[in-house]
Amino acid sequence: MERRKIMKITINYGKRLGKINKFWAKCVGSCHATTALREDWRKQLKKCRDELGFEYIRFHGWLNDDMSVCFRNDDGLLSFSFFNIDSIIDFLLEIGMKPFIELSFMPEALASGTKTVFHYKGNITPPKSYEEWGQLIEELARHLISRYGKNEVREWFFEVWNEPNLKDFFWAGTMEEYFKLYKYAAFAIKKVDSELRVGGPATAIDAWIPELKDFCTKNGVPIDFISTHQYPTDLAFSTSSNMEEAMAKAKRGELAERVKKALEEAYPLPVYYTEWNNSPSPRDPYHDIPYDAAFIVKTIIDIIDLPLGCYSYWTFTDIFEECGQSSLPFHGGFGLLNIHGIPKPSYRAFQILDKLNGERIEIEFEDKSPTIDCIAVQNEREIILVISNHNVPLSPIDTENIKVVLKGIENCREVFVERIDEYNANPKRVWLEMGSPAYLNREQIEELIKASELKKEKVSWGIVNNNEITFDLSVLPHSVVAVTIKNG
């Protein structure tokens, strides 16, 4: 692809389009519950909370046997222990976060079969007794309210299971059996407190939304929100080459179309996307490079005006055990941070998105490139312009030269850019230059953290007239550029 024309972006300062809803910072994902007992996991989550503003966290396996939640005594009666759950929630509250509790997987004491998923062997079978399943959920809800109080727990979310539409992967039962599982969990939660929030179906590919709504309506089953997941492709454990081919077949911007459809199907219930990423593979090289940053920013810009409850990125860390814990610093993991806590380009994308405080302002385009997306916001001190240059893999994309015109500004003090691209905020590039060491020492970790940082680059601007300035930008393929214009 070759574009000879210079693209022009005109920002109309003062023409406000409304406040930004930071739904992407409402929640973030992680692996399974026991990793939340690790000190390094906790340190990384606190960093994300402090720097990216995430409010909730969601992960699998609150009820797994490795959490020691549910046992059957010698007399056949059930026994419960919420000690590990308390440890996790205590920590979350301590750092100013809250849990988005996914009710999974099935404790062995309740399970009807032995089918499991992942390296940590979460049981995916329906319960032998739905009454006992309801008993477990009720006991959990009662304990949480007893420990943390109604007002606190009412701010949390209870989501029933994970991707039950992926037959024999996450759920060994039928859709009807999932609805029964949901019904018993929802009634158990509402029995404890009618104001606790419960929802589902937590499906892959935006599935089962009208079906669950219809089931709940016809059967008088409580439901407070719809949750679902989306990825441009659903080849979760394919080879990297197959994954690239599948990603290349995805339609650019298709996630936004699917979000709109989900909102229509769920109405009037709110929609919470509790997983999304550029692919569902935990070994996808694109997760580690600037491509992912451009994809993230482009996707958020596409859906910025939609009334989402949350859009929870999967995941914040590469401390992740679904396929076993990889020791490679850059192994294509989902995380915003790698196993050592080194920020990837995706992390820096969220850091740039966190700058979008204030109100959106109008942008006009001339000779717009089909791979460019951008958003501008203003507040009392500055204007922020964020640009993504993104296309799906193996598709045309080029460096874009852009002239920016800012109209209506009375006092410009400074303009600077921060970049995420092949040469900036790209620690994997430096790791490859090191020779791709499998195990990093302290000095290498520090060097890679430094390589990951956003760097401020001053931009020269020209004054067109008293209320108008202009400057030029170059935006590399699969990159993000954030421009800050200081005016106060």
From Swiss-Prot:
PROSITE patterns: GLYCOSYL_HYDROL_F39 (PS01027). The keyword DNA-binding does not apply. It is an enzyme of class 3 (hydrolase). GO terms for biological process: xylan catabolic process. The keyword Hydrolase applies. GO terms for molecular function: xylan 1,4-beta-xylosidase activity. The active site is at residues 163, 275. Coiled coil: none annotated. It catalyses: Hydrolysis of (1->4)-beta-D-xylans, to remove successive D-xylose residues from the non-reducing termini. Its EC number is 3.2.1.37. Keywords: Carbohydrate metabolism, Glycosidase, Hydrolase, Polysaccharide degradation, Xylan degradation. Belongs to the glycosyl hydrolase 39 family. Beta-xylosidase is an intracellular xylan-degrading enzyme. This is Beta-xylosidase.
